[in-house]
Curated annotation (Swiss-Prot):
Cellular component terms (Gene Ontology): cytosol; mitochondrial inner membrane; mitochondrial matrix
Cofactor: a monovalent cation
PANTHER family, alphabetized: FOLYLPOLYGLUTAMATE SYNTHASE, MITOCHONDRIAL, FOLYLPOLYGLUTAMATE SYNTHASE-RELATED
Taxonomic lineage: Eukaryota, Fungi, Dikarya, Ascomycota, Saccharomycotina
Name by which UniProt lists this protein: Folylpolyglutamate synthase
Length: 548
């Protein structure tokens, strides 16, 4: 480093913190309607967004040690910050057409071309609701064929308790040791290589890909080094411009139920969202989707399949699964499990393990190993039931209208006959939280009434700190500290709740758990839903209690 640049990282940190205060506190930035009429303001904020991106991603934290904790700290330095995300939302800057070109370049710099990933025999899954569950089902089915497929990779997002959950082999998160090993192999390769600034002007020396892109690169590196015979990849957001879409030749693609989500990136309509999701389709790789897709979305998916010179087949729920207890609870999971059956069938047939593909018919016969795989699927935080002392916890993360309706319906149907006290624990920090609570309330009422409702933040510990793997920079720290979302939720709940449940606000998940333990001497049913960060944080709190 040149002598004149010795204090550059400190200057960056200082400037970044002061700039953030200006942005978050300036009155103009809190009024979206002013963006429409003030071109200079829009330009200024986009430029500020660029500076934030430059400061955070272009100059990520430089590590001395190479432990797992060091890896997580370094990875967290690649997260997009709240101001950056808000700038994208406000300006409507949905598309970064350089994403895939940059992913190819990042791959080159760590020693791979996209064609190297073809050997992983990939299942590529997109959708709005259920894609993680479908990926888990598919991986579990393939895992029943260990003799022929000794290692199955699984890449999903987000994680609940540990970032290692995103990169699994044979259903288990890779170890802390392997995560750190492969993480720093990728990190160091990026540090020791450069890109042409003429072709990639943002990829200055020392720069790194963002959080999700880095993890995607890490997953490819890990699965290749571990000699995985087949891998299941869940899309991050959308499909067309998702970083996983450098996959050139998947064996098969799947699309779970479509809905409205990530509108600032994918569009405001089902048609736009379907177009983005269909971007993962590839020539020669058959595509499957669940039945009962929104008609407009299905039409677009079919058009995308034709455009990409492949087929799209709707998968009906298999009758053989009607009486099967799936590893992931919820009646709606039968559709995801059926889709997983067809995806796994393609992999196993292509690998010459199944002589014939399973017929895509509700009356088709499903092999016993498939059934076992579906029954043995483990997926924390999705329709999960935990007994803790005198209480029973019903846990299901949900961040869209459709997923909230499904989660709430599952809870309602499961506890309908229970006479226990009912408690709701909820948070959603980065989406329309009040709308989700309204969906929740209308889905459980009038059969279920809550005695107590607790709105918390996603902060893990009452000390104000987060579990290292759960640090998130994409929410307003000011809103968290002032409990703005939680106070708004209380007001909204009091308007819609005829039963007049007692409402509470806590500053951390640990405090919410302690409050619940003291509310009643008698047993209670507790419904935990909303943010997956809340779900993951609660499970981390439980883990610490169990250790004690």
């Amino acid at each position: 480093m040149h002598k004149g640049k010795k204090n550059y990282p400190n200057l960056i940190t200082s400037f970044r913190m002061n700039l953030k205060k200006i942005i978050l506190n300036h009155d103009r930035f809190s009024h979206p309607e002013r963006w429409k009429t003030n071109a200079l303001l829009r330009f200024t904020f986009v430029y500020i967004k660029f500076l934030f991106d430059l400061m955070i991603i272009k100059n990520p934290l430089r590590m001395v040690g190479k432990t797992y904790r060091d890896a997580v700290t370094a990875l967290n330095s690649l997260q997009s910050n709240y101001a950056n995300i808000m700038a994208i939302r406000q300006t409507g800057d949905r598309k970064n057409t350089m994403t895939l070109l940059e992913m190819h370049e990042w791959s080159r710099r760590i020693g791979y071309s996209a064609s190297d990933f073809n050997k992983l025999n990939i299942v590529h899954i997109t959708g709005t609701k259920g894609k993680g569950s479908t990926a888990a089902f598919t991986s579990s089915i393939l895992g029943q064929y260990k003799e022929q497929l000794p290692r199955i990779g699984l890449y999903t997002s987000p994680h609940l308790k540990s970032v290692r959950e995103r990169i699994r082999i044979n259903g288990e998160p890779i170890s802390e040791e392997k995560f750190a090993k492969y993480f720093f192999e990728v990190w160091d390769r990026l540090d020791s290589t450069t890109s042409s600034l003429d072709k990639f002007p943002h990829m200055i020396p020392g720069s790194k890909p963002g959080y999700f892109k880095f993890l995607t690169l890490l997953s490819f590196h890990t699965f290749i080094q571990e000699d995985c015979k087949s891998c299941v990849y869940e899309v991050g957001v959308g499909g067309e411009l998702d970083s996983t879409n450098i996959i050139e030749k998947p064996i098969v693609c799947g699309v779970t139920l479509l809905g409205i989500d990530h509108t600032f990136m994918l569009g405001d309509t089902i048609e736009e969202i379907a177009w983005n999701k269909g971007g993962i389709f590839k020539s020669g790789a058959p595509a499957f989707t669940v039945e009962k897709q929104p008609p407009q979305g299905l039409t677009i998916l079919k058009e995308r399949a034709e455009e990409r010179k492949t087929t799209l087949t709707e998968v009906p729920p298999f009758k053989q699964l009607e009486n099967v207890k799936l590893g992931i609870a919820g009646e709606f999971q039968k559709s995801n499990a059926s889709l997983a059956v067809m995806l796994a069938s393609e992999i196993l047939h292509t690998s010459n393990i199944l002589e014939e593909k399973i017929k895509c018919s509700s009356n088709a016969s499903i092999p016993e190993k498939f059934i076992i795989g579906l029954q043995n699927t483990k997926w924390e935080g999705r329709c999960q039931v935990l007994e803790k002392g005198k209480n029973v916890w019903y846990i299901d993360g949900a961040h869209t209208k459709d997923s909230m309706v499904a989660a709430s319906t599952w809870f309602r149907d499961t506890v309908r006959l229970s006479k226990r006290k009912k408690i709701l624990l909820f948070n959603q920090q980065s989406r329309d939280a009040n709308a989700l609570v309204n969906n929740l309330y209308s889905s459980v009422s009038p059969e279920i009434t809550f005695d107590d409702v607790i709105f918390t933040t996603n902060v893990t510990w009452k000390s104000g700190s987060y579990s290292a793997d759960l640090v998130s920079m994409n929410t307003s720290q000011e809103d968290v500290e002032k409990l703005k979302v939680q106070e708004s939720l209380v007001k909204n709940w009091n308007k819609i709740d005829d039963n007049r449940a007692k409402t509470h606000v806590t500053a951390s998940i640990e405090e919410a758990n302690e409050l619940i333990e003291t509310l009643y001497d008698e047993p209670a049913d507790i419904f935990v839903t909303g943010s997956l960060h809340l779900v993951g944080g609660l499970l981390v709190v439980f883990d610490r209690i169990d250790v004690k």
